[in-house]
């Protein structure tokens, strides 16, 4: 168990009528009950989910049980706090508020204005940003819309962008396209050129990136990853951007919690725009943020006139009204709660533990003979290359899923198939939120190794992926092996506490 305490809210929700100093809602008053009479037998909106929709309630309980008894290793997942979940499931879901604080297209927005401004302030505080030099838009629904909004603000249709290639650890929204098709909207609306890893080192090839940028002349270079286990050299990318007169956008979706905790380098010193999700290492509700530079960009050497940044109005207009309608006020409030948590010493301790756990996981895998892309990790994840073992990520993912270990198949450099890629991506944030330490992650690697060995045995007896999956379920000996491993995994996992609500 962790030596430090994860203080999640444990008190049960109180009904509105129990809140001291607040007016009792009219439908709870005696007069309202008298007026409604028999109508009270109709819809009131006060029924619990378990009473109103037992079928959905049972599905939620099953998912909660799956999370409690399993080992969650998907690098982009985490366990949100009860406090943030309470905000997410609040009355804020009811309020429509197109526009921005003080400039809404709907009335009754006084409170949500305060909530959005509070979220903005906390976002800047979480990353130690001067409000005179940085602003933030907290309305993006998630990371992909945040990226598209940033591109829309900075670029014209068919302008050129560069991002890390998806098989090398990039993200779909960084301009991904295959040899035969434009996959992401960011490659449909803009002309994209990927940069790649050095195949010998597994690290971003900055020299080749610079050479490609000189030839391609992009308007925007994206510094961000989804399956890259090393730190990004933002200073080097800034140099490239300055040389080719491109904007630098840092997508820190995976690492924003680590940046806020100051346990890895920050992109803010070098980037023009920074985007992020809020539910990964930041451990909040699902949403997105766009940070942008403001203030003085330069001084005209001839006239001495200050030249300001123009990102603020462009970013805000791109989010609304260009791409979105009303913001999700419940999500903004939940993000604000998580951002407050991210400013605490406890969160820094948590983030340091993520790095320790990821390192322990990487070392344990190497000791067992596994190959890791780039040879290790500097952040919250490891990318295992299973090809030297003779297995692929799709088969490994399915075996692990059957023993209550959740991971995801992932492309490795040189992969040609997204259906059966050679990699398996493993992340430390979620289990660290449950209190796992280094020794616990070493045990987790032991379970993974057992699962991979089962997969290798079954692969030797089958051909196609579908045959492999069917054999896992139908072969008695294999089923017995899986059941035994699953029982040990679940017994191990249930011993650790789970953030959030107790029953859903």
From Swiss-Prot:
The modification N6-(pyridoxal phosphate)lysine is found at residue 280. Its cofactor is pyridoxal 5'-phosphate. CDD domains: SHMT. Pfam families: SHMT (PF00464). Disulfide bonds: none annotated. It is found in: Mitochondrion; Mitochondrion matrix, Mitochondrion nucleoid; Mitochondrion inner membrane; Cytoplasm. Keywords: Acetylation, Cytoplasm, Membrane, Mitochondrion, Mitochondrion inner membrane, Mitochondrion nucleoid, Nucleus, One-carbon metabolism, Phosphoprotein, Pyridoxal phosphate, Transferase, Transit peptide. One of its GO terms (biological process) is regulation of mitochondrial translation. The modification N6-succinyllysine is found at residue 280. Hydroxymethyltransferase is inhibited by succinylation at Lys-280. The modification Phosphoserine is found at residue 470. The modification N6-acetyllysine is found at residues 103, 181, 196, 356, 464, 469, 474. In eukaryotes there are two forms of the enzymes: a cytosolic one and a mitochondrial one. Belongs to the SHMT family. Homotetramer; in the presence of bound pyridoxal 5'-phosphate. Homodimer; in the absence of bound pyridoxal 5'-phosphate. Pyridoxal 5'-phosphate binding mediates an important conformation change that is required for tetramerization. Interacts with ABRAXAS2; the interaction is direct. Identified in a complex with ABRAXAS2 and the other subunits of the BRISC complex, at least composed of the ABRAXAS2, BRCC3/BRCC36, BABAM2 and BABAM1/NBA1. Identified in a complex with ABRAXAS2 and IFNAR1. Interacts with KIRREL3. This is Serine hydroxymethyltransferase, mitochondrial.
